[in-house]
Amino acid sequence: MNREITYEDLNKLNYCGAIIKEVSRLMPTVSVLFRVSAKPDEIAGYKFLANTQFFINVPAIQMHPSHWNQPEKFDPDRFMDSEQQIPKNALLHFGGGARVCMGKQLAILQLKALMVLLYRKYDVELMDMSGGIKYSSTVVNHCEELPVKIKVKHSA
């Protein structure tokens, strides 16, 4: 397929969307979300005053076994199964609630387009399938090294 990719095409790529969610679940872009309580509240027996600062540990939520079956396993299919309920706020790859990232839908479309354009013209393989990914885990996480082999696909 050599034609231009359309918005409609990208919206049909459900498995690409599942891959994006699963990669983001296992390796979130941010490790911590910050929130401030608007009013006094009680959660699980603990009382919090208004203006209490909360630091939300994103990897802990996204890897918690009460939210995910086999949380350490890369499994995009977990997002394809309409029967499997993902608990609210168990996936925070773009934040959540009133402060969810405004660019979420655009970013997902761009990632899908990147996947299509890359894999349309190239074969991409990890150099070491058993090796881990070298990344820096700070407030904003990023990959430091990921050796890959890229080959141009030849047209038939």
Predicted regions and their residues:
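C-terminal helix/juxtamembrane-tail motif
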Residues: 53, 138-156
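Hydrophobic, repeat-rich solenoid/adaptor surfaces of innate immune receptors and signaling proteins
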Residues: 58, 111, 148-150
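Conserved, non-catalytic sequence blocks in retroelement Pol enzymes and Pol-derived host proteins
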Residues: 6-14, 45, 99-105, 136-138
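Cytochrome P450 heme-binding "Cys pocket" and the immediately downstream C-terminal segment
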Residues: 80, 87, 104-141
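Conserved cytochrome P450 K-helix/beta-meander segment immediately N-terminal to the heme-binding cysteine loop
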Residues: 10, 56-83
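Conserved cytochrome P450 K-helix E-x-x-R motif and the immediately C-terminal K′/meander segment
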Residues: 2-44, 65
